[in-house]
C-alpha cells in the first residue's frame, strides 16, 4: 500500500493539523516561518505529499511541540497496519 493511503500517515496528518490549529497559526504563517510556501504545507495537510522526518522536526519546532510523542503515536498505529 502506498504510504499516503496508510492509516498511520493519515493519523500523522490529522495530528499535524491539530497542532497547527491549536497554535493559532495559519498554513501561510507556518510555511513562512520555515521558508516554505503555503502550498507546500497544504499538500502535506491534504495528504498529497509525504513528509520526511526532518520536515516533521521543522514543523515541530515551528509549532512548538515534541515530535517524539507524535512519532510514538504514529508507530503504535503503524504496528496495527
Role assignments for model-derived ranges:
Residues 20, 30, 41-44, 59-60, ...:
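Hydrophobic packing within well-folded, soluble alpha/beta domains
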Residues 50-52, 80-81:
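Short, solvent-exposed alpha-helical "recognition" segments
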Residues 1-11:
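A detector for short, charged/polar N-terminal pre-domain segments
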Residues 1-2, 61, 69-81:
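Short, charged recognition helix plus adjacent turn
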Residues 14-33, 58:
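Short basic helix-loop element that most often maps to the first helix and adjoining turn
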Residues 35, 54-70:
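DNA major-groove recognition helix of helix-turn-helix/homeodomain DNA-binding modules
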Residues 34-51:
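Recognition helix of helix-turn-helix/homeodomain-like DNA-binding domains
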Amino acid at each position: 500500500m502506498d504510504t499516503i493511503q496508510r492509516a498511520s500517515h493519515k493519523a500523522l496528518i490529522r495530528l499535524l493539523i491539530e497542532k497547527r490549529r491549536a497554535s493559532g497559526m495559519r498554513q501561510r504563517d507556518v510555511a513562512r516561518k520555515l521558508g516554505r510556501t503555503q502550498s507546500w504545507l497544504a499538500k502535506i495537510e491534504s495528504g498529497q505529499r509525504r513528509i520526511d522526518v526532518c520536515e516533521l522536526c521543522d514543523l515541530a519546532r515551528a509549532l512548538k511541540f515534541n515530535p517524539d510523542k507524535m512519532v510514538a503515536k504514529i508507530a503504535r498505529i503503524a504496528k496495527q497496519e
